[in-house]
């Protein structure tokens, strides 16, 4: 069974936003945890949209991870609407164009996000910036 991952970010006109998303995509791809890893954007004018990314994938099951800090409209309404899933919070499983799709929870409450916040501060001393 081929497994895929779509990382969904908000989207921005700034190139750096896409570059950061690509960095995470590449790291996950190199881990070998999934057969395919793609990025997509929830903002309507950014491509690819999540449905487009899913259509391009040759996988039996695709996990969609919202790279968002909490449940906002993109996670509770826009993403489910786009894939024909019920609105609201929580993990959602269903089928989209013949593929099993699982919309995961946004990452904001994960303990690793807490550690990333702390690391952002601790990194200052290691990089030789900030504290003197």
From Swiss-Prot:
Query: Which GO BP terms sit in this record?
Result: anaerobic cobalamin biosynthetic process
Sorted alphabetically, the keyword list is: Cobalamin biosynthesis, Cobalt, Lyase, Metal-binding
Which superkingdom, per the lineage?
Archaea
Name the residues that span the membrane.
Answer: none
Pfam families with a match to the protein in the record: CbiX
Which Gene3D superfamilies does UniProt cross-reference here? 3.40.50.1400
Q: In which pathway does it act?
A: Cofactor biosynthesis; adenosylcobalamin biosynthesis; cob(II)yrinate a,c-diamide from sirohydrochlorin (anaerobic route): step 1/10
Q: Catalyzes what?
A: Co-sirohydrochlorin + 2 H(+) = sirohydrochlorin + Co(2+)
Please tell me where Co(2+) binds in this chain.
Answer: 10, 74
Tell me how this protein assembles. Answer: Homotetramer; dimer of dimers.
The UniProt entry's sequence similarity note says: Belongs to the CbiX family. CbiXS subfamily.
Q: What does this protein do?
A: Catalyzes the insertion of Co(2+) into sirohydrochlorin as part of the anaerobic pathway to cobalamin biosynthesis.
What is the recorded name of this protein?
A: Sirohydrochlorin cobaltochelatase
Q: Which organism is it from?
A: Archaeoglobus fulgidus (strain ATCC 49558 / DSM 4304 / JCM 9628 / NBRC 100126 / VC-16)
């Amino acid at each position: 069974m081929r497994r895929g991952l779509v990382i969904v970010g908000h989207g921005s006109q700034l190139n750096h936003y896409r570059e950061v998303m690509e960095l995470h995509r590449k790291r996950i791809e190199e881990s070998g945890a999934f057969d395919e890893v793609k990025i997509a954007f929830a903002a309507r004018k950014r491509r690819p949209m999540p449905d487009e990314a899913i259509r391009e994938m040759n996988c039996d099951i695709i996990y969609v991870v919202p790279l968002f800090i909490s449940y906002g409209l993109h996670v509770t309404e826009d993403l489910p609407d786009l894939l024909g899933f019920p609105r609201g919070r929580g993990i959602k499983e269903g089928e989209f164009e013949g593929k099993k799709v699982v919309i995961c929870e946004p990452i904001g409450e994960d303990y690793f996000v807490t550690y990333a916040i702390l690391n952002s501060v601790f990194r200052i001393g290691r990089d030789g910036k900030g504290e003197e």
